[in-house]
Amino acid sequence: MKFPQKTPLFSISAWVICSLLTSGCAQYASVSERRPNFPASLAADGGGLAKRLKAALQKRKSQPAAGLSSLLLEARAASRELATNPANSTARDTYNFSVARIVDTLQQAQLAPWEAPLRIPSSDGELILTAKKDSRPGWNPALYKFVPADQFDVHGKYVHEHSIKPGIGAPIVAIGRDKNRSAAETFSLPHIYYGVTAVIRFRGPVAELAFEDPLATETISFEGRRQPLSADFTVPLAVMLQEAEPKKFELARLLHPEKYAETARISRLQPYDPNKTVVLVIHGLMDTPATWTPLINHLRSDETIRQNYQFWFYSYPSGYPFPYSAAILRRQLDAIGKKYPIRKPMVVIGHSMGGCISRLLITDPGTELWKKIFRRSPNQLALAGETRSILEESLIFDSRPEVGRVIFVAAPLRGSDLATHWLGRIGSSLISPPRLLFKVGQEALQLATLQADELRLNRVPNSIDNLAPNNRFVRAINTIPMSSRVPVHVIAGDRGLGGNKDKTKPVQSDGVVPYWSSHIPEAQSEKIVSSDHSAHQNPEAIHEITRILKLHRAESK
């Protein structure tokens, strides 16, 4: 008889974590291209308009110029009707639908009016299609593939709310043709997926195509009056999510942080606007910036938020100990501040471990944190140059002057017992320490004298270790107050299972972070929402964040 071989502990541990990761996880975003539906007002039209549009769509397959001609004439007729009757919804729908199909035809036929005017014969004489010149960096249409937003079917956990804005123009997804090679120096995304709105203005036989930014422009000049600019805020985010596949990086960046070191950076989600307040979002353990999609998608549907805020995110390998991730963030803030000066106090929103990082942005420890960790001052310790540099950067720092408000969402500021639970210990043991931090950790372990009840390790602490309530750093940082200059807000999840708000078991919790760990007595506000640990995606929490952002705008005037 053959006995089954014993499964190595590593394999069991990996299986446990992977099982927890994949169970019950819906797809973040699923996108597929489809034939666009006629707007309801056009579908209901039984006359010549719908027939002419259908004929134009059929014609453009084999005769792009003829199809463009028909679509331009329909767009021009609708534009003229809107000049005299701007409330005519059928004319608006006809115009927007025609412009979307014109952009799609240009792409399919590989025609580029931004390179040279297109002369197009029509039943009403020759039409000349040109493109508006745009000198802004990155706004050269030749850099992008343009797909009308109404040609996408969008589903998924993170994009179930479809945020659109009615108005003039065809919402378009601009997809970068090549990798963005200036991403690091411009703090932008490595691959561009951005929502623009196509507008065609007619002057006699000339039709001028322009791509407007709906995050920068609320209204446009159209046929002699200001008109709201149409927008689709959801489809570009969904396309980006599907192409980026963030889910495959969540576990990988936790277990192998050194491999993904270059992903520790701030990135802008839109062109920099010095007149808008920055909202910097910071994700948590085993997560990516994709986790903020439901929040950003909803916030962009609010005109007040669009007009006054711009969104940046800080991404990092979540296997790093969070004091080190905070040190990298401070470096990034220094760098981005030189290129894009932050003129208004920014709002930082941190979820889970991202909240712990956020806390370090508004703390002034001086050398106090160092002394609490090592029981000696910095000049009393003999440390190698690189080790000393990393430890000083992580433990001796000032609060950030550009931060004007912080929102903590499900943040384990005093740790989580899950980090000391058997599953947390298994997860911690699977994280491969970066070589540089391993060396630093070995030297630091020899110098730190632990108390009897403190977390003991024979290796460098990682992110999970840094979330243990009995971790020395966690204990030390909680003896140092946050800056009274910066108002803070707390949003905590509650699964509705009852429990105590103090450490008396059973405790009130979101399933990961207990209330006693996230509560801040001096917070300007505290909101408990009916949620598990993903409180930042909860509708109640999103509503509360919207309220706080509007409060920040009002108080910053």
Predicted feature locations:
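Bacterial N-terminal signal peptides
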Residues: S11-S23
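Serine-dependent carboxylesterase/thioesterase catalytic core
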Residues: S32, A55, K59, A66, ...
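Short, flexible hinge/linker loops that cap or flank conserved catalytic cores
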Residues: P271-P274, Y340, R400, M482
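Short, solvent-exposed loop/turn segments at secondary-structure junctions
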Residues: M286-D287, S318-G319, T367, P412-R414, ...
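Short amphipathic alpha-helix adjacent to the substrate-entry channel of hydrolases
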Residues: T293-Y309
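C-terminal subdomain of alpha/beta-hydrolase-fold enzymes, centered on the catalytic histidine
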Residues: S432-K557
